[in-house]
Amino acid sequence: MAKLYVVGTPIGNLKDITLRALETLKSVDVIACEDTRHSLALLNHYDVKARLVAYHKFNEKECGERLVQEIEDGKNVAIITDAGMPAISDPGAVLVKMCRERGVAVEVVPGPTAFASAVAMSGVICDGFTFLGFLPDKKRLKVSILSKYASSTVPVIFYVAPHDLKKTAKDIEEIFGDRKVYVCREITKLHESVTITSLSVFDAEERGEIVMIVEGKTEEDNPLTDMSIEDHLRHYLDSGMDKKEAVKKVAGERNLPKNDVYQVALTL
């Protein structure tokens, strides 16, 4: 029976391809790629000759229907992305969901993942972590997401485009406060590096593919609770958080009833 193979590919070093991934890519009829031109560098290097189909976030449903039909017609299909595992901050989840709903077999061929590699190489100590991928561009959405995880005691991991690096660090500091941060750059590539700094003095270089690990909240006192409730609320409102979210956050940080904080918010 034909299948969809979800195949992990190298995140920088072509030698990180697995034997099973190569065997799979050489055996399938079709390979769905995020960017066919980008994937050709890997596929040509290993003499993979399957037919390529462009599958990306702008054609996931339309192309996905065609790919599922090809599998139902007896052709084996693999999906890869530009780097790492499909469906993790990359296209793939929609196609896998369509296959599951239609009873089409799905098999994973695991490979490198940038956020897991970053945790391993950074030196951050943790028993768990939260992975958020890329933050949205819109300020309101970004604030809403960050505010949900500001009190997390485990590290929070982000993917960051180089041109957004300093802005993202500033946005995170506005909601999280000052934290230690690990900037993992160009993982498995020639200029691989880890910069350990803090959000308040952040000055990491804006180049390369970046994974940012922000340490979780410690048990130390929150300096914001030394402010008045009014100033505490203003801190979050000025960062772009809406009143409801700010009230919830301040109430949680001060261990106060939300209604009490809300009454203060009404006076601002």
Question: What annotation goes with each model-predicted range?
Answer:
Residues 1-58:
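Glycine-rich, flexible N-terminal cofactor/catalytic loop recognition
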Residues 94-152:
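Class I SAM-dependent methyltransferase SAM-binding "motif I" and its flanking Rossmann-like core
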Residues 2-4, 74-78, 155:
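Loop/turn-to-beta-strand initiation segments
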Residues 91-95, 243:
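Glycine-centered tight-turn and secondary-structure capping sites
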Residues 55-61, 135-139:
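Conserved helicase motor
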Residues 155, 159-268:
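A contiguous loop/helix-start segment that scaffolds small-molecule binding in enzyme catalytic cores
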Residues 25-31, 104-106, 155-156:
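Short active-site oxyanion
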